[in-house]
């Protein structure tokens, strides 16, 4: 009986195989007959071999009958060596993906080996997972593995925060702010000048300074730009975003109405806490409101009287006047009525600053664009008590600004005539010019009454001296002024109707009375004292 370990090979008579001219494909290899059942384990291991076509290079034809079995047995050590090599390569099969050409070479080498042994075999095709097949066909798997091999581990950076919660920076790149030094200098200057100003309350960290400035700035909802002046923000909305400007106006009106209601509620709570509110005497003396009273047009809506056009359609009402913040000079802190006045001020007082530019980081004003790139952008001389926050650029300007606007309990400039206080010297001068412009006064020689002109004093003294210049022609009334005599004639005498003896102070009223009540008209169109005509109606003047 044959050895079971020995291969059973089916031989055919004079099998002659020519040299292949083309490399067989996988489809042709699949058509070869499979190995018969009962083959040994050696053949099972042989199925996993991969032999290059160069190792199976043969020429001519051969017959299986003439092949010596010893030659077949000589191939067994070679097969075992290749088996060991293949088993080692299988360890890395999960890490590398073979190309389609390598699969073809695998089938070609196995067929040539089987032909050399005089057998036919079927190339085993390993079934791969669908994901690996797609990755192999598209090349994504190999590419992703290359990427995974090149990714470096993430380096964690340690961030250190200071006591304020900000990130600690390199002091060479971020030098310390000089705000504390400037505040100490201002305090010493205040004591030297003898002015008791309150100590400046300003942060010393430049990051907190920038945060405070951003909080006090107004930001546009649409373009996210920031504005330090509210009037500039309103002009920006009016010119760039008209739809937002209308909404902004409505919000301002609602805010004003809300403040008014809050004030009324606060007054009501105060009345409840204090036990009632006692109105002043002048309000008590006034008559109570009549419930049947019909208000005049525009009386209850702020004086806005509706207007109608020729066709009876109501006209568009004008928006009520609202006080806006006047523009201010960034160099000398003066405010003006409008932008035109501010431009005139620039041309007159700051000729070199007509085309100035303002930095949006430190809010300094420079002459032109060239100096904007080279200016010292720092927040050192900042006044935090102003709204909006102002950067005065120099210590001298900051000191003068605090003396002028932030004097604490001593703030305000007092008028020497009426003891009123004003915020700036300019407002004090304006008050004196408007209220105390009359430097000369004229006093009556008979009493202590004072007049602003000599003519007024002479007219008043006629009452004491008895000099009479005007006498009434109807009664014995006398007056020293013409206006007083005219008032007497109109009030005491006036015009009397000849029919019903009704009295009227003005001639047009008398004329209208005669036409409406008596169905006639006056004989004369001029207010003559005595008129006699053939007409029925006679007009009398006086009693």
Swiss-Prot record:
InterPro entries found in the cross-reference section: Znf_C2H2_sf (IPR036236), Znf_C2H2_type (IPR013087)
Zinc finger intervals, C2H2-type: 218-241, 327-350, 381-406, 413-436, 442-464, 470-493, 495-518
Transcription regulation recorded as keyword: yes
Keyword annotations: Metal-binding, Nucleus, Repeat, Transcription, Transcription regulation, Zinc, Zinc-finger
GO CC annotation: nucleus
Sequence ranges of Basic and acidic residues compositional bias: 10-20
Gene Ontology biological process terms from the UniProt entry: hermaphrodite somatic sex determination; negative regulation of vulval development; regulation of gene expression; regulation of transcription by RNA polymerase II
Effect of residue 493 to Y: In bc45; weak masculinization of hermaphrodites. Male-specific cephalic companion neurons (CEMs) found in 67% hermaphrodites, and hermaphrodite-specific neurons (HSNs) found in only 24% of hermaphrodites
One term of GO molecular function: histone deacetylase binding
SUPFAM superfamilies named among the record's database cross-references: beta-beta-alpha zinc fingers (SSF57667)
Region: Disordered, residue numbers: 1-38
Compartments (UniProt record): Nucleus
Main location as per UniProt: nucleus
PROSITE patterns, per the entry: ZINC_FINGER_C2H2_1 (PS00028), ZINC_FINGER_C2H2_2 (PS50157)
SMART domains from the UniProt entry: ZnF_C2H2
Family the entry assigns: Belongs to the krueppel C2H2-type zinc-finger protein family.
Known partners and oligomeric status: Interacts with histone deacetylase hda-1. May interact with nasp-1.
Summary of the function given for this chain in its UniProt record: Probable transcription factor. Promotes normal hermaphrodite (XX) development, in concert with histone deacetylase hda-1 and nasp-1, perhaps as components of a complex. May cooperate with transcription factor tra-1 to repress male-specific genes in hermaphrodites. Synthetic multivulva (synMuv) class B protein, required to repress the induction of vulval development by let-60 Ras signaling.
Listed name of the protein: Zinc finger protein tra-4
Species the sequence originates in: Caenorhabditis elegans
Taxonomic lineage of the native organism: Eukaryota, Metazoa, Ecdysozoa, Nematoda, Chromadorea
Name of the gene this protein is made from: tra-4
């Amino acid at each position: 009986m044959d050895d079971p370990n020995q291969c059973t090979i089916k031989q055919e008579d004079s099998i002659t195989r020519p040299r292949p001219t083309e490399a067989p494909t996988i489809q042709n290899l699949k058509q070869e007959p499979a190995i018969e059942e009962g083959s040994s384990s050696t053949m099972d291991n042989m199925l996993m071999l991969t032999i290059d076509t160069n190792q199976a290079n043969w020429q001519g034809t051969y017959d299986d009958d003439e092949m010596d079995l010893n030659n077949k047995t000589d191939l067994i050590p070679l097969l075992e060596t290749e088996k060991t090599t293949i088993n080692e390569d299988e360890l890395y099969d999960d890490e590398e993906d073979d190309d389609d050409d390598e699969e073809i070479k695998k089938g070609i080498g196995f067929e040539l080996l089987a032909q050399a042994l005089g057998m036919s075999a079927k190339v085993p095709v390993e079934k791969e997972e669908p994901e690996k097949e797609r990755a192999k066909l598209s090349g994504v798997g190999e590419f992703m593995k290359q990427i995974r091999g090149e990714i470096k581990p993430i380096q964690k950076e340690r961030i250190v925060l200071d006591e304020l919660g900000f990130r600690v920076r390199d002091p060479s790149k971020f030098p310390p702010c000089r705000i504390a030094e400037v505040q100490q200098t201002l305090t010493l200057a205040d004591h030297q000048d003898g002015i008791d100003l309150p100590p400046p309350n300003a942060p010393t960290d430049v990051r907190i300074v920038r945060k405070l400035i951003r909080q006090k700035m107004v930001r546009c909802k649409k373009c996210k730009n920031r504005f330090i002046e509210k009037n500039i923000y309103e002009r920006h909305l009016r010119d760039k975003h008209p739809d937002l400007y209308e909404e902004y106006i409505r919000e301002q009106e609602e805010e004003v109405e809300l403040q008014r209601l809050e004030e009324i509620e606060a007054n009501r709570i105060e009345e409840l806490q204090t036990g009632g509110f006692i109105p002043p005497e002048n309000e008590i003396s006034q008559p109570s409101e009549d419930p049947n009273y019909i208000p005049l047009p525009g009386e209850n809506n702020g004086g806005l009287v509706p207007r109608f056009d020729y066709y009876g359609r109501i006209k568009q009402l004008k928006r009520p006047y609202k006080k806006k913040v006047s523009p201010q000079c960034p160099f000398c802190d003066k405010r003006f009525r409008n932008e035109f006045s501010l431009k005139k001020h620039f041309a007159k007082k700051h000729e070199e600053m007509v085309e100035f530019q303002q930095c949006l980081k430190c809010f300094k004003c420079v002459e032109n664009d060239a100096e904007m790139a080279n200016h010292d952008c720092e927040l050192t001389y900042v006044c935090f008590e102003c709204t909006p926050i102002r950067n005065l650029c120099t210590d001298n300007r900051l000191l003068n600004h605090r003396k002028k606007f932030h004097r604490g309990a001593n703030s305000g400039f007092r008028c020497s005539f009426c003891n009123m206080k004003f915020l700036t010297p300019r407002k004090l001068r304006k008050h004196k010019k408007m209220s105390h412009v009359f430097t000369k006064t004229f006093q009556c020689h008979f009493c202590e009454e004072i007049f602003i002109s000599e003519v007024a004093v002479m007219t008043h003294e006629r009452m004491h001296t008895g000099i009479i210049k005007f006498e009434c022609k109807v009664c014995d009334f006398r007056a020293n002024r013409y206006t007083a005599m005219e008032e007497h004639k109109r009030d005491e005498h006036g015009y009397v109707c000849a029919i019903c003896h009704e009295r009227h102070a003005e001639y047009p009223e008398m004329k209208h009375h005669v036409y409406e009540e008596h169905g006639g008209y006056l004989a004369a169109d001029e207010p003559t004292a005595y008129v006699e005509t053939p007409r029925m109606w006679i007009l009398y003047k006086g009693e």
